[in-house]
Swiss-Prot record:
Glycyl lysine isopeptide (Lys-Gly) (interchain with G-Cter in SUMO2) crosslink location in chain: K249
Matches recorded under PANTHER family: U3 SMALL NUCLEOLAR RNA-ASSOCIATED PROTEIN 15 HOMOLOG (PTHR19924:SF26), UTP15 U3 SMALL NUCLEOLAR RNA-ASSOCIATED PROTEIN 15 FAMILY MEMBER (PTHR19924)
GO terms (BP aspect): positive regulation of rRNA processing; positive regulation of transcription by RNA polymerase I; ribosomal small subunit biogenesis; rRNA processing
Keyword list, A-Z: Acetylation, Isopeptide bond, Nucleus, Repeat, Ribosome biogenesis, rRNA processing, Transcription, Transcription regulation, Ubl conjugation, WD repeat
Subunit architecture: Part of the small subunit (SSU) processome, composed of more than 70 proteins and the RNA chaperone small nucleolar RNA (snoRNA) U3. May be a component of the proposed t-UTP subcomplex of the ribosomal small subunit (SSU) processome containing at least UTP4, WDR43, HEATR1, UTP15, WDR75. Interacts directly with UTP4 and WDR43.
Biased composition (Basic and acidic residues): 497-516
Protein's UniProt name: U3 small nucleolar RNA-associated protein 15 homolog
Keyword rRNA-binding found: no
Keyword Endoplasmic reticulum: no
GO cellular component: endoplasmic reticulum; fibrillar center; nucleolus; small-subunit processome
Residues with PTM N-acetylalanine: A2
Length: 528
């Protein structure tokens, strides 16, 4: 009796992504560490100085985390309401933050109580930053104003009322202590100069501005709002260089890599995009579990921290280079081990005993071997198999079709099982590699369950989706055939023109030959 032959699973070539230096660089992070905060993480900021701690603003607290710690090393909770935008000074010794009650507070990293409190805004302060000289603070609030504060005197220096809506983002120049940028929900980004008491440049973003970023050189400005990330040339009067639209939802945060060669953007679509600052093309992408509100990179891009709307803080650390350790050398086998049995001579009375190799059968092969066709189909319709290895499911359907028992395997199913089969068909019917097998399966399942259509709303919806998918595929095929017809006509025209060239030596017009009609008499005959 012949043994059972396992089902041959057809393999298909997999087109992998192109491996680039950016892919290797940005994939070189460990598994993320997740920290639960008390509320949505609105801001993450790294200290520019060692030991590169980072401040996390969530709810009414500001937590200071060590670079590799999962517990806060310090907490600032002197806020009556929600805290916003905790930002380090360049020396890493002071921290400034806004709040929902309109008060800007200045903290010493080594203390707990605020060193300064700047009161002047009437509504929530969503953006604060230190100027380049480290002696002034810029703040923007929902009262449409931008204020400049003096740290030593705790006084307000200037107030700008240039915006007509909430001021939700801003940053100060790292080179010029008098320049700072603000973005507002009035769709504008304004650059202010403390020496002129007014904005010196205004660009129209076109959407409510959620984040702004000034390059370290001060020559380029990046604004984010809506689905757009726009780059402006400051040296050319705010000329738009490029408009990027790679996110599906609102872009909420921006960040630069340590080298300044890569721009990162986070969005509510749960993705972080990495752009090249030379070509402005996406070179890498990160996926997260929830919508992203804040993003920060540490020194040398060693750590990437992302804050999300569900209060989860995701921390990724770069993998350290594994040190090569010298293992103890194993003792090599003796020479006689290798030549053992080579000099043995077979005898006439020797009996050869062969042990049959035991074949390992998959679960679906065991079911098919026992003619349990329905169980075999159920096994390959499990979500794990359908998502990871759909070719296995298609191979089993093909084997059932070859045996002529596919209708038996599909019949007698309840609403949940029929829905699972229809979901697989909807997911893979339009793929060219699976279409020949699945079209036959779709016809069989329609024939079986056509009499009971209308008894289950869930199954009816799946059949409608399947019908729309087939109609859309037919439209695609019709358009492709029309395109092929157009191309054939063009190729035929080109071939005909190339095959009948006009010779260059043939004159355009041939001279007419003078011939006399045989019926007309000549002049000599007339004279005679």
């Amino acid at each position: 009796m012949a043994g059972y032959k396992p089902v041959a699973i057809q393999t298909y070539p997999v087109l992998g992504e192109k491996i680039t230096q950016d892919t290797l660089y940005w994939n070189n992070y460990k598994t993320p560490v997740q920290i639960k905060e008390f509320g949505a993480v609105s801001k993450v900021d790294f200290s520019p100085q060692l030991p590169y701690n980072y401040a996390v603003t969530a709810s009414s607290r500001i937590h200071i985390y060590g670079r590799y710690s999962q517990e806060p090393v310090k907490t600032f909770s002197r806020f009556k309401d929600t805290a916003y935008c905790a930002t380090f000074r360049q020396d890493g010794q002071l921290l400034v933050a806004g709040s929902e009650d309109g008060v800007v507070q200045l903290f010493d990293i080594n203390g707990r109580a605020p060193l300064r409190q700047f009161e002047g805004h009437t509504k929530a302060v969503h953006t604060v930053d230190f100027t380049a000289d480290n002696y002034h603070v810029v703040s923007g609030a929902d009262d449409y104003t931008v204020k400049l504060w003096d740290i030593p005197n705790s006084k307000e220096i200037l107030t700008f009322k240039e915006h007509s809506d909430y001021v939700r983002c801003g940053c100060a120049s790292k080179l010029n202590p008098d320049l700072f940028v603000t973005g507002s929900y009035d769709h504008t980004v304004k650059i202010f100069d403390a020496r002129t008491n007014k904005n010196v440049l205004c660009v129209e973003h076109g959407q409510p501005v959620e984040s702004v970023l000034l390059f370290p050189s001060g020559g380029l400005l990046v604004s984010a709002g809506g689905r757009y990330v726009k780059v402006w040339d400051m040296l050319k009067g705010g000329q738009l260089l490029v408009s990027l639209k790679n996110h599906h939802k609102t872009v909420t945060c921006l960040c630069l890599s340590s080298s300044g060669q890569r721009l990162l953007s986070g969005s509510l679509d749960r993705k972080v995009k990495v752009y090249s600052t030379t070509s402005y093309k996406v070179v890498h992408s990160f996926d997260y579990a929830a919508s992203i509100l804040s993003l920060a990179l540490s020194h040398q891009d060693e750590t990437i921290v992302v804050g999300m709307t569900n209060g989860i803080l995701s921390v990724k650390h770069r993998k350290s280079e594994a040190k090569k350790t010298s293992l103890p050398r194993r003792r090599r086998p003796a020479y006689r081990t290798f030549i053992k049995g080579k000099n043995y001579l077979k005898q006439r009375d020797d009996i050869m005993v062969s042990r049959p190799a035991k074949k390992h059968l998959e679960g679906y092969d065991k079911d098919l071997k026992s003619f349990r066709v329905s169980q075999a189909l159920d096994r390959v319709l499990e979500p794990k198999c359908v998502i990871r290895t759909p070719e296995v499911t298609v191979s089993i359907i093909k084997e059932l079709t070859r045996r002529g028992v596919l209708a038996n395997a599909l019949a007698g199913r309840d609403e949940k099982e029929v829905t699972r089969v229809l979901n697989f068909l909807i997911r893979n019917l339009s793929q060219p590699r699976f279409a020949p097998v699945l079209i036959n399966a779709a016809e069989i399942i329609i024939d079986i369950y056509l009499p009971v259509i209308g008894q289950s709303s869930v199954v009816d919806k799946k059949f409608i989706v399947l019908q729309e998918l087939v109609e859309k595929e037919i439209d695609y095929q019709r358009e492709l055939l029309e395109t092929l017809g157009m191309m054939d006509m063009l190729f035929a025209t080109m071939t005909r023109n190339d095959s009948d060239p006009v010779p260059e030596h043939v004159p355009a017009e041939l001279p007419e030959e003078k011939t006399e009609s045989p019926t007309q008499p000549s002049d000599t005959d007339k004279n005679s």
